[in-house]
Amino acid sequence: MIFHASPGIIDLGINIDHVATLRNARGTTYPDPIAAALLAEEAGADLITLHLREDRRHIKDADVRALRPQLRTRMNLECAVTQEMLDIACDIGPQDVCLVPERRQEVTTEGGLDVVGGFAKVQAACKQLADAGIRVSLFIDPDAAQIEAAAAAGAPVIELHTGRYAEATDDAELRAELVRIETAVEEGIRWGVRVNAGHGLHYTNVQPIAAIAGIHELNIGHAVVAHAVFAGWQNAVREMKAIMVAARLSSTTPAAAHPGVPV
């Protein structure tokens, strides 16, 4: 079996933000994140993820607009819950929008969206995007209250923040965080939402997450960009997809369908 060309087992979303970070470091036109996205598709990526931040530190508006009509898979646009970003998303019309928390001083997204604390605002954002024909995902911590709030807000998809798992410093902490994610996946299924995951995943920690049968999609970027420095971009994409699919196929957890959960 060619693992990187195995659709439907588990999807890989390639985040191209850090290709844009390299480009912007010198203010050049290269490396081109659009070219990276198209090559990633050829190498087996099931979707392309990119984060249009309010400060435009990596991805620019022009990148999103230029890339949207060229993709053969799906565009998953990450953005903050602000009216400016929601309006941009509705204008561009990606297949998916993942709403994320955002602080200007952070290096990368540091935690999940607080849907419980900002319920009315998130619910309104979900409605605006859904009315524009865009599927909405909420990037949240693996927490039962946040999952319930996400479902109540009208989000058909959640993306579980795997940062604490990725940053675990010993086996006990790692196992505890993995159990937390597994429990959150079950909770998401119970609420009838599609469950994705991502943040901090790389070539040696992705396997246990990819093996969880209830997870539909993993979004990974920095690790692939970093690995590509040594392995080459398309090889890096292929290797990550192969690792994920192999982990899922070798999992002892039955990959049973869950009625009522959107795909």
Curated annotation (Swiss-Prot):
Active site at 51, 78, 199
InterPro entries attached here?
A: Aldolase_TIM (IPR013785), PyrdxlP_synth_PdxJ (IPR004569), Pyridoxine-5'_phos_synth (IPR036130)
Q: Which reaction does it catalyse?
A: 3-amino-2-oxopropyl phosphate + 1-deoxy-D-xylulose 5-phosphate = pyridoxine 5'-phosphate + phosphate + 2 H2O + H(+)
Q: Which UniProt keywords apply?
A: Cytoplasm, Pyridoxine biosynthesis, Transferase
Positions contributing to 3-amino-2-oxopropyl phosphate binding:
15, 26, 200, 221-222
**Cellular component annotations (GO), alphabetically ordered:** cytosol
Q: What class of enzyme is it?
A: transferase
Q: Known PANTHER family for this protein?
A: PYRIDOXINE 5'-PHOSPHATE SYNTHASE (PTHR30456:SF0)
From the Swiss-Prot or TrEMBL record, give the protein name: Pyridoxine 5'-phosphate synthase
Species: Ralstonia pickettii (strain 12J)
Tell me what gene encodes this: pdxJ
